[in-house]
Amino acid sequence: MAVTETILFLLLVAIGTLVQSITGFAMGLIIMGGVTALGLAEIAFSAAVVSLISMVNAVVALRHTYRYVDRIFWRNLVMGLVPFTIAGLALLHILSTGFTEGLKVLLGIVIILAGGLLMAQPHPFGHSSGRFSTIATGSAGGLVTGLYGAGGAPLAWFMYRQPLDVNVIRATLLATFLVSTAGRSAFVTVSGQLTSEIVLTALLSIPIVVVVTLMSRRIAPFVPDKLLRRFVFLLLILLGASLILRPIYR
């Protein structure tokens, strides 16, 4: 990427990291949507970078919260997530050869749906979800992670409906994101798709991810949750709509 494109990419990384650190998800969607809408890079490239920096974000955020992880939910989510992440990545490889515009439209749909989930205020279930529904949710998140490196929306919506403490929910989500992004990155590396440009862009992004994640702990108490959610919702809707409508008006 050129200098201007790299700066824009890093700006999207900073915005996405701040939102993710406060709300629990949306970093990958903001980066993927912004990069794709602005034409900064191909989907496969952006998704690979997002996976690497999301992995770092999860590691940094889990330093003080890993004790809160609900291991039963985490295990069941991962059981569905890992195989479907691989399936989504394989599907991305197939579709990238001749279905690029379709991938962008599908990304737009995913982003808009995620925006809707972000604004939804689901009432917690009366009891914890069972093993099957947890694995199914992990599978859905894994498929989107494999395709776009950003499958947090269904996982976050599902976990925030559980009758659990919010610290447990956030830590469990972060631990799940860590597995999904690490697994995706490992598969990309083994399959020979990890280029030097992907690594360089990720290395430039990682300091921003670390600094913004640490700063967000001080900023979060002063940011109204509803205001932030509305801002992110509007941003996601605009990004998603631009990706869906672009082929129509070309």
Task: Please state what every model-predicted region is.
Residues 1-16, 21, 33-44, 60-142, ...:
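Juxtamembrane transmembrane-helix boundary motif
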Residues 17, 47-54, 173-180, 236:
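Transmembrane helix-bundle signature of multi-pass membrane transporters/permeases
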Residues 23-31, 147-156:
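Transmembrane helix boundary and interhelical junction motifs in multipass membrane proteins
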Residues 31, 60-66, 154-159, 184-194:
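Generic transmembrane alpha-helix signature in multi-pass membrane proteins
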Residues 31-42, 155-168:
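Interfacial segments of multi-pass membrane proteins
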Residues 41-50, 72-73, 163-175:
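Membrane-interface alpha-helices at helix entry/exit sites of multi-pass transporters
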Residues 168-188, 199-200:
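Hydrophobic alpha-helical transmembrane segments of multi-pass integral membrane proteins
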